């Protein structure tokens, strides 16, 4: 008995999409990260309405938490404790920061990687925020994550998905982002060196997960 042409096309289409989904899953599994459970969640009781407003310059000047080592296993599933600092903040606090968004990139783990700087004419001395994949966050955060990612696609990238290739926006946008203050210990203790593009990261502190984005006035 011959296969019906329409049925054959449907089967082939299903096989194609299954391969795409499988490939995406394998890629994410191969992308090894640290502190995933911390940077894809909020502490119990955290409220976005009580976010502390910080300038990009203030956050850039926030010192590293003392005693934290590179890829510190003590904090793989635990937030870094509070320490004395001029801003009175700690990892896990909800913060709101505004700056010029210069770079949007899709990472191997599905995160949207954003780079903000204090000026419109340069991405140098940037701060990082990342918006996780919806599948990687607790159910209560998924609506916010979906809205944040949709903002990036619709308001920043004209309806397109971010590229996996690092690209600078032709017209930087002044944007306010609210999310968790997170310390990226992957490079803790390393000297501050420029990246492959000759640009400097202003701080190891990030807004991660980034949850709410909006256009802002300077």
Outline where the language-model segments fall.
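Bacterial N-terminal signal peptides that target proteins for export
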Residues: 1-10
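Bacterial N-terminal signal peptides
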Residues: 9-20
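Bacterial Sec-dependent signal peptides at the C-terminal "C-region" and cleavage site
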Residues: 19-27
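OB-fold and OB-like single-stranded nucleic-acid-recognition modules
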Residues: 26-218
């Amino acid at each position: 008995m011959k296969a019906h042409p329409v049925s054959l096309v449907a089967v082939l289409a299903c096989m194609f999409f299954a391969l795409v989904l499988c490939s995406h899953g394998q890629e994410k599994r191969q992308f090894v990260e640290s502190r995933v459970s911390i940077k894809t969640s909020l502490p119990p009781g955290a409220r976005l309405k009580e976010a502390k407003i910080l300038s990009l310059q203030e956050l850039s000047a926030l010192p590293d938490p003392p005693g934290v080592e590179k890829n510190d296993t003590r904090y793989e599933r635990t937030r870094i404790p509070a320490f004395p600092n001029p801003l009175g903040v700690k990892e896990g606090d909800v913060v709101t920061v505004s700056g010029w968004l210069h770079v949007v990139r899709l990472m191997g783990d599905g995160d949207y990687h954003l780079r903000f700087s204090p000026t419109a004419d340069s991405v140098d001395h940037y701060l990082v925020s990342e918006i996780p994949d919806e599948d990687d966050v607790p159910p209560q955060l998924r609506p916010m994550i979906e809205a944040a990612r949709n903002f990036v696609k619709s308001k920043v990238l004209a309806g397109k998905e971010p590229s996996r290739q690092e690209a600078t926006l032709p017209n930087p946008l002044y944007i306010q982002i609210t999310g968790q203050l997170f310390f990226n210990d992957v490079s803790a203790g390393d000297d501050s060196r420029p990246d492959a593009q000759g640009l400097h990261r202003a701080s190891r502190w990030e807004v991660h997960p980034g949850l709410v984005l909006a256009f802002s006035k300077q």
